[in-house]
Structure formats: C-alpha cells, structure tokens
Amino acid sequence: MFGGFALDTGFRAWAEIDIDALLHNIKIIRSAIGDEAELIAVVKANAYGHGDTQLCRYLGDTVQGYAVACYDEAIGLRRTGISGRIVILGAIVESCIPGAVKDNISLTVFSADTAKKINDAAKAQGKRAEVFLAVDTGMSRLGLSCDEAGLCEALKICSCDALDTHCIFSHPACADIVSSPVTGRQKKIFETFIRVLEQHGAHIERKCFDNSAALLGYGRWGNLYKLGLIMHGLLPAENLHADLIPTLSLRTRVSQVKTLEAGEGVSYGHTFIAPRRIKTATLCIGYADGLPISLSNRGGVIIKGKYAPILGRICMDQMIIDISEIDDVQTGDVATIIGRDGELVVTVDDIAKLADTINYNIVCGIGMRVTRVYIKDGKQDSAYSYVNPDIR
C-alpha cells in the first residue's frame, strides 16, 4: 500500500489501486520465473475486483496475455480495445464459439467434441483458432481425465487441422497446504500424461501447472504462468511469503456525525445499544459495496489515523462507527476500510478473518458503485466508475 496517508479523491466510496505496487509485484514474479516464461495475467472477476480493462492497459507488455473465466469477460475486454492474447479458462457455450473465433479469443478445451466445433467454426471463417488443453490431475474440476480415454481425446484435439494448441495446463488443488502430498502427486501425473502424449506425436509449446500458491510454495515448473492473486500483492495462504506489495485500498467518507445517549440503539435490530454517551459517524459504504455484513459489531475502520469500531448492523449503503476517542471528525472526512492511514493498517486478510472467509472473496466482492482510482507516484492517474459514465 502506497504512502502513509489516506488520499481524498472526492468520491463517495472508492478503491485505490497502486500501479507502482502492481508493477513491482510483476517484476518480483518475473525475476522468479525467468525471462523466457510466458506470463498470463488472470483478470477474471473484474481482475479480482481491481478493474479488468484498466489493469490490462497499465500492465501493457509486462505480460503476454490475459485470462478470464467466460466469454462475456473476454468479449468485454476486446470491445474496450484490449488486443493480444485473451484466453477463456472456463467452458465455452456452443453458441459463443463463432464469436470467440472471430475475435481471436483462445479457448480452453477438454473434449474432442468441443474441439471439433471450434475447428469447424475456424474453418468456416477461413482462419485458425488457438486452444489451451486442460487436464484434470486431481482438482476434479474441468479437464481431460488422465487415463487412456483422456489421452485419446487429447490426441483427437491435437489433430484438428484448424486448431493451434498453444498450452497444456493443469490446476493444483492443494498447493496452499505445504505438507500435502497432493501437489507432488498431481505433478507426476501431469508429467506422465504429457510424456505419453508427446510419444504419440503431439507437440504443445507451452506447459503450465500453477496457481499463486504453487508458484510461491513449489517454485518454477513449465514455461507459462498464470498470475492471479499474487499480482495484487495478496497471498493465497498465511504460510506463504514473498516480497509483494498489496495494491488495493478501500475508502469512503463520513456523511454525518451524531451523539448518542446511553441506552440508544444503532442500526437495524438495535444489535448495539450505547452503554454510555458516545459519538458516532455514519459512513457512505455498505454491504452492497462489498463490505461483508458479518463485520457488523466486529472490526473497524481507520479515521484520522485512529481506529474506530463498527457499531450495529452494516446496512446496504451505509455503516456506523464509534468515533468517541477521535477528535474533530467532520462530515466529508475520509475513512479507510482497507489500507493505511498514518501508522495504522487494515489489510484484506484482516477483514477476511473477521468475516470468516478468504481474501479472494473480499476483493472480488467490491461492488460496482465503488469508483476505481488508479494511483501512480502517489497521485491519482485515472479513475473509472461502472455506474457514472462521466468518470471514465
């Protein structure tokens, strides 16, 4: 997180994304995997809440492509001018195949039937289509089975005359559990599958067995890496470590300051009753903006460099905090939900623990009403609102 201050952008609620931290993280990852490996930035789920199109533009040539989960995300990037490789990691609906081929979107395949449909669409358009071959080595999710039937399917896919199979990949299931034998077992299964596939004449240039936890916990393997959570300076497990910088801060502002007398209740259901005379501030952010409602009466925010506990039930658009120990709080003051203000920091992981969830869930849940503000050199470089077309 950049600096030691809360930036006031003038918005109701906003997420600051530190581009200098983002590029630092990419540099650290690049140094770990070497210059020859291909980097694919995973920007599904709106780049884990950080803003997909905007991040793609800032990443530029630091990565060799982008990965999304579905066709809608892929076509959204294309329509906003993002060029280069975009790969859909999930399944493709049959009706979307011609459009994906037309827009040069790479597709993940795990059946010869789907591969044939992509192949037919490519031939009908007089072009070639790029595919990524998914292999299930233990995640029990998408992918070819690692048996004779799966091998036959893979060979059929690789023989399609209008397809370029750019990468074969598999996804670790337990890489965040260092003591688990599953990751090593998956690697061996994957290596055997590739070896037998190549013995049958198939050649696939890029090989990938990774996620953020695997890269940090098990090091290099293959020559293509998909960068997800760690790109944003967040770690997939507490036992993993890296010299990464969190890129995201989440802030809002005070809408009203009040004094409550002993016995007065706060918010829906009066789940908090003032034990004495207290001073409160209402903030312009709620669970519709991504703040977990499970933080009601738990956790807190930072305002003027001091900690302010959350009072009562978090509302859809607002929340209330105790500012009794903070002097001179006024309407319009900035409150930090995630990030640093002065000497205090609230991390994504702090919130995830209180909400009994994972850091992925917190950042992916940041809502559309929260303006994304992109910071370079400690200053606002650009901003994007999903609901206000004047902020783009």
Region spans (language model):
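Active-site anion/phosphate-binding pocket segments in diverse small-molecule metabolic enzymes
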Residues: 2-23, 31, 73, 92-94, ...
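Active-site-proximal beta-alpha core segment in soluble small-molecule metabolic enzymes
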Residues: 2, 8, 13-17, 21-24, ...
